[in-house]
Structure formats: structure tokens, C-alpha cells
């Protein structure tokens, strides 16, 4: 068996990626989220496949087909809620994974990090299009509002929006193409995740200290396979509790009303995992400025390696940077809260302050603090 594992062309790839892979001996549970994201993606693809067998991407029947899945298909309700809440678990793992990368300086692996940013955009696009498919009120109006943002692009904006819509409004053509893209994108995400791993295995994993661990490596199996299985069990437990006890906790009640172009919901808002970006978008009174801020709120991650001024890689031994990191986390939670609130005083000014702080922290305050820490250590 050992010889086959190391000799067979396919097994050799699996062996060098998941079995005999040299891994640092001191990586903490924060390094579990990569494998958890893989599990989330598999869950989403499988549940999505079974949902697609019963779903119809037509404006007349989309909403009733989702109802049919929940009422008439064997365990259809379970598959539907696993898929909907699986997306939430996916984003929780994503945010923690990115946060880990920021804290421990994993962004210094430039190729891996940039593929990761690309993956984040791809997953966000997939989730947005998936939210449109049930064709409820929030699906329809969310699609209308977000696609309409592209009209802010000078010269080609309005033509681009109509091209994406496939007409003069969000209608049957839009729903059909969103379903097609929502089906294909997870496979693109899976391919990108493979490239992400490929680049990671070129350098080996980072570790909490941010120091080279070449002198102290252990095989991935059995140490980290067992550790990852624990993470998977906890993820599955959390997802199962969410699905079986409060499946609609993270959803919007408006989406249980069929889409009606003549009736606008009082508060149009996306799913909870987009609220921070939505708050940044709304905090700028200008349409084009808001769109740019929205894109930059994620794209800024690609510039993080260029803004690294510290002579230490990780924040493990940098208390000032640690404080700023947790302020950033609190700021993102504030933005998430603001994104779900109506556009009125005092939420407007809180959102604007939180948005300014978000960009200031990442672009100015953290790099300057890193330089200060270098000086304090007389480096």
C-alpha cells in the first residue's frame, strides 16, 4: 500500500498534499479553516445539485418550485436549509480564514493570498446569484439594486446593466442566466481552490510565530487529519443545530413573499454576510463613489502585503498591532450591524465613521504602528 501511495500518479498527488505533506508542528486551530472551507464547498455543491434537480429557473414557477422542494420532495426541506445555512457557515469560515491570514501574516505568500482574494470575490458572486434564485421579494429587489450599481460606470454603465438583465428590467432572462452562473461558479471556485493549495504547497504553511518552521516539520497525517476531523465535526454540529432548530434565523422574512415588481420592501438589504460591504456602499452619498468603496472594501485585501511595514511577519509578538486588529474586527461587526439598519439618524453617521475607520486602519494606522513597533524594538 505504501509503495502504491507513493508510486501511482494520482495517489502520489494526494499523498504529497494530504498525507506526507510536511507541516509546521505548532499550527493552531486557526489553521483548520482551510479544510472546513473545502468541506463547506463539497456540502454546497452536493446539496445544490439535488436542489437543481427540482428547481425551475422561470419567473412564473421559481418561487413555487422552492415551495414544492420544501413540501413535497423527500427531505427537500433539509436539503434546502442545508444549502441556505451552509452558505452562512461558508462565510463564517471564510471571514475567520481571512482574519487568521491578516493576524499571522500569511499574506506574505503573495500568490496564495491573491488567489484567495480572487476566491473571495468568486464565492461572493456565487452567493449573490444564489440569493436571487428563490424569486422572493428580497431576491428580486436585491438583484435590482445590486445590478443597478453597474450603471454608475461612466459611458457604458446603462448598456452594461441592460446586457446583464437581458432586457429593460430584472426578469425571466436575468433569473435564467443567474441560475446558469450559480451552477457553474462553484466548480470554478473548486478549481481556484486547487490552485490556491498548489501555491501554498510551494512554500509550505505559515505558523503562529511567523518564523521559518523548516527545522521542525511533522507529517500531515495522522496529526492534522485528526485535528481537521475535530473541526469538521464541530462545523457539522453547528450547521445541523442551525438547520434543525432555527433554519430561518439568518434569512429574511420578506423572501417568503413572491417577487412583486410593483411593491418595494421597506428595507432592501442583502444576506448578513454582505452587510458590512453594503454599509460601506451606503455610507457614501455619491453612486459611483459608493460602488468604488464597495469594491475596494474587498479589493483592499490584495494591497495588504504591500502595506506590511513590520520586520516581524506575525502579530503574535506585536501588542499594538494586536489592539488595532481587534479594533478592525469590532469595526467590521459595527458595519455589519449598520448594514441591516434603516437609512436614518444616527445610523448614517455611525456607518460613515465606521467606513472611514475601516479604510484608515488598513491603509494608514496599521502600517504606521508597525513602523513604530520596529523603532520601539530598535530595529
Swiss-Prot record:
The keyword Transmembrane helix applies. It comes from the Eukaryota. It is a multi-pass membrane protein. Its cofactor is heme b. The keyword Nucleotide-binding does not apply. Component of the ubiquinol-cytochrome c reductase complex (complex III or cytochrome b-c1 complex) that is part of the mitochondrial respiratory chain. The b-c1 complex mediates electron transfer from ubiquinol to cytochrome c. Contributes to the generation of a proton gradient across the mitochondrial membrane that is then used for ATP synthesis. Heme 1 (or BL or b562) is low-potential and absorbs at about 562 nm, and heme 2 (or BH or b566) is high-potential and absorbs at about 566 nm. This is Cytochrome b. It comes from Cryptotis goldmani. The gene is MT-CYB.
